[in-house]
Amino acid sequence: MMTPRLKEIFNKEIQPALKDQFGFKNIYMTPRIEKIVLNMGLGLDASDSKILKSCEEDMAKITGQKPVTTKFKKSVANFKTRKGSIAGLKVTLRKNKMYEFLDRLVNIALPRIKDFRGLSPKGFDKFGNYTFGIKEHIIFPEVSFDRADKVRGLDIIIVIKAINKEHSFALLEKMNFPFIKKGDN
């Protein structure tokens, strides 16, 4: 099996550059991506088996692996949810599939978003993990616009092993993530 393009770039260029930039003693101290979690909330549509199956197929096409269903933990009358009923779909990507997905996300999917100005650098938590949302899952070329019954959103969480969020930001910036610059609005 071939090594993904982004993983080769990470090992040969990005990791040594981060090591020099932050003055780490060895390459294992540099920030690295551990996993990517994608979540698609379905809400009340989850009770319809056709819609659920269609969304499962779309998530499988986008990520390359079968999604797992998530369930509501509590019943909330205002949201018409019942404990144990399906809330959405979730996929966790690691290793090669993770790098392949990131490559497609940054170079193909994000540029296809209409009026896209960049990702907000405010999506980092105190541990350095980056979270952002996409309003349309059809930006991925694997999903057919005509076949999609409804345009759905995706939550993407990039779990990064890093000392702080500045190191995480530097890692994603070197991976060509299109962040909004300070002066741009």
Give the residues covered by each predicted segment.
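Ribosome-associated RNA-binding proteins
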Residues: 1-185
